[in-house]
Structure formats: C-alpha cells, structure tokens
C-alpha cells in the first residue's frame, strides 16, 4: 500500500489518496487551533497523541457494534480510513454545561444536564459554524430527515459507550463533537476523529481538564493532559 497525492489539508490533519480503492491515508498534525483558527500553535507530539487516542477509541467502538471509517493505525501519526463524503454538520452531544453552551445561555459550567443534549452545527468557517435546527438542516439540504434521526441515534449510542469507557478510568465526559460521512453505498459512518481535541474530559474527582481547553483557555500543558488520557485508557485497552 502506497500513500498517494494530498487531497485535503485541514487544521489538524492531512488527507491523502491511498493505493487501495475506497481508502484514504490520514496524517495527524502537531498544530493546535482554537476559535476557528484565530489562535494557532505547533505543539510537538500532539499528532501522535491524537492518532493514538482516536485509533484506540474507534477500535473500542467497533467492538461495541458502532461502525466508523477507521480501518487501522498505520504509524505514530497516521491511520487508514474508509473514504466517505463528509456531511457538513458537527453533531455535538452535551452531558454537562460547558463552553459555548454556558456562554450562550448564561448557565454556570459544571451543571449536569438531566438528559444528554444533541446539537447540530453547520460546518462553514466563514459563518463561524452556526448552531442550526433540524428545520435549518432541511433548508440547507445537507441531510435528509431520516438521516438526521439516524445521526442522533448514533450520537446517543456513542455517548453511552464513551461515558462508560471514560468512567472506568475516572474521567467525566462533559461533551464532544462528532462528524459523519456517507459511503458510496449510502451507509452512514462515524468519521473524523474522537480525541481530546473533540471531547471535553474532566477528572471525575478533581475536575482537572484533559482536553483542548488547556490550549484554548491557557489552563496548562496540552500534551500532558492528552498523555494522561492515553495513559489511563491504555491501561485497559489496546489497539
């Protein structure tokens, strides 16, 4: 198998063509960004940590019957994935008030929600990735109503599994962002990554943060926080 031409470069990853049809080569970057790229820094070792954590979580979810684009880890910073057409929606699941929800609604961070909240954001950097309703999604015509229902169902299933996974290692899953894509056959698959870049993760007892808020809010060393998550998960699971 051979890495082909560069197809796309985003804030955190590069996507390459693979010599195998229907597969893509993902390379994680050491770049950390926040506020739609307004804050940016290169942090040595971040690519390896995100690749390892995301590979581990995708492999764990696969064992629980939740399909994703992930095929296998290729190197410290690379993984092989199934080619999908990404749906331009970020699916955010919230278990505890934090981040933009706290700011938007004037609610104190750290308050547990009575039930998980699922939100949709339209992926458009120029618009600032706005929060959208299901009616907005229909107007934008980016996903059919039955697909939106399936996205919510899959997001809820991922939430249940991740809550259990992180609780086992003393970590509280505050909220997280998912992306999904369609295969050529029309199957919806979990895509992108699941890592401290896309999840808020707090120590269950001390509420210490192990996620991108370390960088976003200048709360501490990002690599140390991510390494703590990998070390805790690595004690139980192996890719």
UniProtKB/Swiss-Prot annotation:
One BP annotation, GO: 'de novo' IMP biosynthetic process
GO function terms (MF aspect): ATP binding; phosphoribosylaminoimidazolesuccinocarboxamide synthase activity
PANTHER family: MULTIFUNCTIONAL PROTEIN ADE2, SI:DKEY-6E2.2
Signal peptide from the UniProt entry: none
HAMAP family listed in its UniProt record: SAICAR_synth
Pathway(s) served: Purine metabolism; IMP biosynthesis via de novo pathway; 5-amino-1-(5-phospho-D-ribosyl)imidazole-4-carboxamide from 5-amino-1-(5-phospho-D-ribosyl)imidazole-4-carboxylate: step 1/2
Protein name: Phosphoribosylaminoimidazole-succinocarboxamide synthase
InterPro entries named in the record: SAICAR_synt/ADE2_N, SAICAR_synt_PurC, SAICAR_synth, SAICAR_synthetase, SAICAR_synthetase_CS
Catalytically driven reaction(s): 5-amino-1-(5-phospho-D-ribosyl)imidazole-4-carboxylate + L-aspartate + ATP = (2S)-2-[5-amino-1-(5-phospho-beta-D-ribosyl)imidazole-4-carboxamido]succinate + ADP + phosphate + 2 H(+)
NCBIfam families: purC
Enzyme class name: ligase
UniProt lineage: Bacteria, Bacillati, Bacillota, Bacilli, Bacillales
Organism of provenance: Shouchella clausii (strain KSM-K16) (Alkalihalobacillus clausii)
Residues in coiled coil: none
A Pfam family it matches: SAICAR_synt
Enzyme Commission identifier(s): 6.3.2.6
Keyword terms: ATP-binding, Ligase, Nucleotide-binding, Purine biosynthesis
Family indicated by similarity: Belongs to the SAICAR synthetase family.
């Amino acid at each position: 198998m051979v890495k082909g031409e560069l197809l796309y470069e985003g804030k955190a990853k590069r996507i390459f063509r693979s010599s195998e049809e229907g597969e893509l080569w993902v390379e994680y970057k050491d770049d950390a960004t926040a506020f739609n790229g307004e804050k940016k820094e290169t942090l040595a070792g971040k690519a390896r940590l995100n690749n390892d954590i995301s590979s581990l979580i995708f492999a764990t979810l696969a064992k629980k019957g939740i399909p994703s684009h992930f095929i296998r880890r290729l190197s410290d910073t690379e993984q092989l994935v199934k080619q999908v057409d990404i749906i331009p929606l970020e699916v955010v699941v919230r278990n505890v008030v934090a981040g933009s929800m706290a700011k938007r609604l004037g609610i104190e961070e750290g308050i547990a929600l009575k039930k998980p909240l699922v939100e949709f954001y339209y992926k458009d950097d120029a618009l600032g990735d706005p929060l959208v309703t299901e009616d907005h999604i229909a107007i934008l015509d980016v996903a059919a109503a039955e697909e939106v229902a399936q996205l919510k169902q899959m997001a809820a299933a991922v939430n249940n599994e991740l809550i259990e996974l992180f609780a086992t290692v003393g970590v509280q899953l505050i909220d997280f962002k998912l992306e999904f894509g369609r295969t050529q056959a029309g199957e919806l698959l979990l895509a992108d990554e699941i890592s401290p870049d896309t999840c808020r993760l707090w120590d269950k007892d001390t509420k210490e943060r192990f996620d991108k808020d370390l960088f976003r809010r200048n709360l501490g060393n990002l690599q140390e926080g991510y390494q703590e998550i990998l070390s805790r998960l690595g004690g139980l699971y192996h890719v």
